[in-house]
Amino acid sequence: GWQNTDENSTHSIPPTTARFFRFYWTPEGSEPGSEDMDAAKWKPNLKIKELRLHREARLNQWEGKVGLVWRVAQATKEEEFGKQDCYSLSQVINLTKQYTGHSNGKTLTATLPKGKWKLLRMGHTATGHTNATAGGGKGLECDKFNPKTVRKQFDNWYAQAFVKTNPEIARRVLKYMHVDSWECGSQNWNKRFAIEFQKRRGYDLMPYLPLLAGIPMESVEQSEKILRDVRTTISELVVDVFYQVLADCAKEYDCQFSAECVHYQKVDLPMGEFWLNSPTHDKPNDMLDAISGAHIYGKNIIQAEGFTEVRGTWDEYPGMLKALLDRNYALGINRLFYHVYVHNPWLDRKPGMTLDGIGLFFQRDQTWWDKGAKAFSEYATRCQSLLQYGHPVTDIAVFTGEEVPRRSILPERLVPSLPGIFGAERVESERIRLANEGQPLRVRPVGVTHSANMADPEKWVNPLRGYAYDSFNKDAILRLAKAENGRITLPGGASYKVLVLPLSRPMNPEPVLSSEVQKKINELKEAGILVPSLPYTEE
């Protein structure tokens, strides 16, 4: 899902002069929720803590565009404000030296040109997020852009197992290091960010720093471009620093690196997650991220944290679990992690230790433990033993685009691009679902009310009617993809006959290709790769 709650939302509107303003809202037209539209999963209503009108222009949804929060939004429109509302570089004076150069470091003394000036003070601090499941080691999240702080977190955490015990025994026993789901918000700065930005993007970010407060500069188009570069730099640093340092640490201790989230280039064992009887919390995007990432980067073992549950009601049984597990095996995973098998030290307490109501209760005090748990586990083991020897056959590579952040593409988001493959019946049912007429609700599980028109994964089995697809990122297109015998081939062994460049969707509202990506796609087309015109309507 998306951690979309850390910041406010700013909506750009055309300049308007009035004494009184009235805003209307209606649930009509509200799209049903999905994993790329979390807030829409619930009953459509509007609760406002504060509505503030600005005297000056602000970039549309700038909080997400500057990387304060994971959020995707349309670019600010020229009609919302023009060039006259954007500050030029000549209107900005950097007073940092006058401030930091003062004897006490707290006083600003400067002589400014005549006129009215607005003073903007900018600094940086921790995000405020803590490592919530750390027990006695709880504290602020580390700086993900600094290799020293990442290494320090590792040394004071996982590496302590090799310090507090016999290191030789620890090396024989501890063979895996796992980083679980990303639940630490978003970081958009550190002491070296501007240096890394200039090295990676080729220009100095500091003159444009007011953009990080949503203040437009030069032009709307220029402002959006620079902030896209900011988000790209954030994304690269998370991979090149945080995940790379941890990957190096794992190798140092002879461990395989297992991880959830979307940085599978650096990990040995990608992992997704699927939920049991919990539509509002299910993670089809997580599953497709891990599966596509594993295929792209040649990782044969694809894991899943399975049977997480938002409110356990003690009605689960192996038959229910098997159907859900089979669907995810068919999707592409081949190693299951049970959520949850809690260590239970008591012999005289029933049901013993649980993880509150979160997750399947899978341990010895489950009522059907002696009746079906062993058979179910052995079934999963047999399936995985065969699946791990297999190799995926995938027909279509679907480009995820160049928006940041970006994730794998859910099948329902491909219907407008490939109506001929989905078929008329699916196109019509999707039209009705998205219309969401009357905004119907349902309750599942007990006590959880949400949109009845959500795109449930069980309704999207084999959605392309015999074809399979992987979501292709920019790295795969530019660095890995080659054309051989009419197919896109990757170093890890995957190959694809067709490359699809999807139409606009919520996660990529303006699918514009950069010159380098367009050049590579043209090369692939010239080498015989099929890139169909969209919408593709042939049956």
Protein language model regions, located:
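Aromatic, loop-rich ligand-recognition surfaces of beta-strand-rich domains
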Residues: 1, 5-83, 181
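Active-site-adjacent "subsite" loops/lids of carbohydrate-active enzymes
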Residues: 2-11, 74-163, 194-234, 314
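Carbohydrate-binding surfaces of carbohydrate-active enzymes
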Residues: 18-22, 31-33, 45-64, 163-176, ...
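Conserved long hydrophobic alpha-helices within structured protein cores
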Residues: 21-23, 147-155, 396-398
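Short intrinsically disordered coil segments
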Residues: 38-41, 65-72, 136-139, 193-194, ...
